[in-house]
Amino acid sequence: MRLIKRFFKSVGVLLLLQVAAVNAELNDKEAALKAGFLFNFARYSDWQVAATPVGYFKLCSPDSDFLDTASWVLHQQTIHGLGIKVALVELDSLNINQCNLLFVTHRYREQWVTTDKSLLLHTMLVGETPDFIKLGGHIRFFLASGKIRFEVAPESLKKADIVMSSKVLRLSRIVKEGEQ
């Protein structure tokens, strides 16, 4: 009897590990897709004023798990002739003013609320929480029918001196600044 219980416990643990592995794989896949979107957002946008000219395009996030995937996906890619540097930043740090693009995952929503947005005047701001654009962001990812979609606040981008291609805007849901 004990042997049967132990067997079923082992099977249960294996099933839980398999479910966890599938969830981790889905999260990695979603992060990889979002990194690809970020690459294309940057590729099809023009910065009228560089955030801080440093000789490379700096993609930042406070989420190290996302950055691990983004580093792999964006390895040896370029944006406007510049190599991409993926950088971990803290949202309360002055270093965020050196980012060309900042991606804020849902885990960092509370820090985003208190972030000094004046440090991000010429930075493309992308997030994934429902109120991200209302809280000062430019682009927000959301899921619809199991697919990653995005919405853009073009007027907010314009205030940051960033012009996004109309081709990308046609693929997005357009929102007005402060709306969601």
For each feature predicted by the language model, list its residue ranges.
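Short hydrophobic alpha-helices and adjacent helix-cap/hinge residues
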Residues: R2-K9, V22-Q180
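N-terminal signal peptide c-region/cleavage motif recognized by signal peptidases
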Residues: L17-A21
